[in-house]
């Protein structure tokens, strides 16, 4: 792999900053391009502190000029004094009832901390809301836990699923082939009592072939401690998940591949080129007519959440031919979005105090 160490000299804008507005902390970026071209940047607003549990809302800022300027912050999910988080947005382009496209935002709610959830003391649920006007307004929430997360309140409660988290980051819709139109949300859950090294966690996913009317569940990734996951449809139609390993044993990203839209898994492996601390990362297929580029974003370190780095593959992740360090300091969660035919947006946690949006041009980086 050929490294390019200097930070990219590209436009950057701070969308959320700790201690400003109504929240002490902002985390968990997710970003989406709406059907008419607007960019939607989602985040968690954490009222008291930066902890995962507490009074947490889901926030949105919109840009109608490709990310040059942004709307004021909008609260789109408020679960009272409890937690709403793990935003996973996706556009449904293929529903004939919504020819202009409809946006889904999947999210989780919880009534106790993750530690207590692992002990079976609370309930995590999965919901979605939708927008028919490119993110300006949103529907009432729909709780789909009965179908996609088998906690104690569901008819499959004997499976004893406890924690749950969508992605976080963008979800996906298949755009071609036998599974065209399938909405797929990578996720993870725990099951049963806590195990050493978080080994009760498994990555999985859930999906719909009828625009959210009914839901199916992918089998678990059979790797103990597999955790937060994000996915993409590869040029050959396969589904790829890129997954966090919660116990941190390998310090590498786990990859899972499916040839049937996530109904089964044909291969899992740890990617030796994708080093990582215990943290979330993102992937995106940057689609072009002649050649699609698989892009990865995440902290490029085995020890600390630091060195936000982009990595590029021209063969669906078999080889990573280029990397570009975007920020050498503190860096954690991120998400990627294709802005137009030439540019990609990176929305990431910078220095543990800001959520920053940065534009880059893959061809320019690959030609350096």
What are these regions (language model features)?
Residues 6-368:
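Asp-box/BNR beta-propeller blade signature and adjacent active/binding-site loops
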Residues 2-3:
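C-terminal motif of bacterial Sec signal peptides marking the signal peptidase cleavage site
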């Amino acid at each position: 792999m050929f490294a390019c160490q200097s930070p990219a000299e590209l436009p950057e804008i701070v969308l959320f900053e700790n201690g400003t507005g109504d929240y002490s902390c902002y985390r968990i970026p997710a970003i989406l391009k709406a059907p008419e071209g607007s960019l939607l940047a989602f985040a968690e607003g954490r009222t008291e502190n930066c902890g995962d549990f507490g009074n947490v809302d889901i926030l949105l800022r919109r840009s109608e000029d490709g990310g040059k300027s942004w709307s004021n912050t909008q609260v789109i999910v408020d679960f009272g004094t409890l937690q709403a988080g793990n935003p996973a947005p996706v556009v449904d382009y293929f529903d004939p009832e919504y020819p202009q496209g409809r946006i889904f935002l999947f999210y989780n709610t919880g009534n106790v901390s993750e530690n207590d959830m692992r002990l079976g003391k609370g309930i995590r649920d999965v919901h979605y809301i939708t927008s028919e006007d490119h993110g300006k307004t949103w529907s009432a929430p729909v709780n789909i836990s009965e179908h996609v997360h088998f906690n104690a309140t569901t008819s499959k409660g004997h499976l004893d699923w406890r924690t749950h988290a969508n992605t976080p980051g963008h979800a996906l819709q298949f755009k071609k082939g036998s599974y065209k139109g399938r909405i797929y949300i990578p996720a993870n859950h725990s099951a049963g009592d806590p195990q050493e090294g978080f080994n009760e966690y498994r990555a999985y996913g859930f999906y719909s072939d009828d625009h959210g009317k009914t839901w199916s569940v992918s089998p678990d990734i059979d790797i103990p401690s597999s955790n937060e996951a994000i996915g993409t449809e590869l040029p050959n139609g396969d589904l790829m998940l890129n997954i966090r390993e919660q116990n941190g044993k390998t310090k590498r990203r786990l990859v899972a591949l499916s040839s049937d839209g996530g109904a089964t898994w044909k291969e899992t492996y740890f990617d030796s080129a994708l080093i990582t601390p215990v943290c979330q990362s993102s992937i995106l297929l940057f689609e072009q007519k002649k050649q699609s580029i698989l892009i990865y974003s995440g902290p490029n370190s085995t020890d600390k959440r630091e060195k936000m780095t982009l990595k590029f593959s021209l063969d669906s992740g078999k080889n990573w031919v280029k990397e570009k360090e975007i920020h050498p300091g503190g860096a954690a969660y991120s998400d990627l979005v294709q802005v137009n035919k030439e540019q990609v947006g990176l929305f990431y946690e910078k220095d543990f105090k800001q959520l920053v949006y940065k534009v880059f041009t893959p061809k320019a980086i690959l030609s350096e």
